[in-house]
Amino acid sequence: MYKTNIVFNVLALALFSIFFASCTDMKDESDRGAHSERGALWFGPRLGKRSMKPSTEDNRQTFLRLLEAADALKFYYDQLPYERQADEPETKVTKKIIFTPKLGRSVAKPQTHESLEFIPRLGRRLSEDMPATPADQEMYQPDPEEMESRTRYFSPRLGRTMSFSPRLGRELSYDYPTKYRVARSVNKTMDN
């Protein structure tokens, strides 16, 4: 008797789940999907999820069409003039590989430094007698006079020197123009 009761309960549960799975018109009219009172329990379609649609044509037909298109593409490629066709890749190594320590530079090529116009910051140009790249000793050895003056007055942040440079492209200029131009406001505001 106990076994028949368990079988009956399992059967009733299966019928109940099949009934509710197949019944789609039981949706309440006031139910608005994710915006309902039970929004977290909405099991509607997920946005952006692709549905698995059964393919309408056989995969063999698709594969045959793809092969046919590739054959047509090769036919038209062979019709091109020889200059426009890509060369076939070489299968054998015919050149001796020369070791180059840095990209783009070979060992046999003499290194010459061309004088390029280098602008380190906007609005600033280097003078002709100043080299474009200073030597390492000049870069990493601070000026002794500058070090003494810095320690005497204040200690700026790391990497800062006492020579202050204003905003990029600007020089400190305290020459004010002699004539000023005064214009009226466009939006008709009045000063009281």
Swiss-Prot record:
Q: Name one GO molecular function term.
A: neuropeptide hormone activity
Q: In which tissues is it expressed?
A: Expression is restricted to the subesophageal ganglion.
Which keywords are on file for this protein?
Answer: Amidation, Cleavage on pair of basic residues, Hormone, Neuropeptide, Secreted, Signal
> What is one term from the GO cellular component aspect held by the record?
extracellular region
Pro-peptide positions on chain: 51-94, 171-192
Tell me which domain of life the UniProt entry assigns to the organism this sequence originates from: Eukaryota
Residue numbers of Leucine amide PTMs: 47, 103, 122, 158, 168
PROSITE patterns linked: PYROKININ
Q: For this UniProt entry, which residues form the secretion signal? A: 1-23
Q: What processes does the entry annotate via GO biological process terms?
A: neuropeptide signaling pathway; pheromone biosynthetic process
Effect in UniProt of substituting residue 109 to N: In strain: J106
Question: What biological function has been recorded for the protein in this entry?
Answer: A hormone that controls sex pheromone production in females and pheromone responsiveness in male. Also mediates visceral muscle contractile activity (myotropic activity). Identical to MRCH which is implicated in the formation of both melanin in the cuticle and ommochrome in the epidermis of armyworm species.
Query: Which family is this sequence assigned to?
Result: Belongs to the pyrokinin family.
Protein name in UniProt: PBAN-type neuropeptides
- Organism for this UniProt entry: Bombyx mori
